[in-house]
């Protein structure tokens, strides 16, 4: 899951 700062999924928080 790709979550940019938790927007999609909170497992990867890419800031």
Curated annotation (Swiss-Prot):
One of its GO terms (molecular function) is endochitinase activity. Its main location: secreted. It catalyses: Random endo-hydrolysis of N-acetyl-beta-D-glucosaminide (1->4)-beta-linkages in chitin and chitodextrins. It is found in: Secreted, Cell wall. It comes from the Eukaryota. Its EC number is 3.2.1.14. Keywords: Carbohydrate metabolism, Cell wall, Chitin degradation, Glycosidase, Hydrolase, Plant defense, Polysaccharide degradation, Secreted. GO terms for cellular component: extracellular region. It is an enzyme of class 3 (hydrolase). GO terms for biological process: chitin catabolic process; defense response; polysaccharide catabolic process. The keyword Hydrolase applies. The keyword Hydrolase applies. Defense against chitin-containing fungal pathogens. Belongs to the glycosyl hydrolase 19 family. Chitinase class I subfamily. This is Endochitinase 1. It comes from Capsicum annuum var. annuum (Red pepper). The lineage of its organism: Eukaryota, Viridiplantae, Streptophyta, Embryophyta, Tracheophyta.
């Amino acid at each position: 899951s790709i979550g940019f700062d938790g927007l999609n999924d909170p497992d990867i928080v890419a800031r």
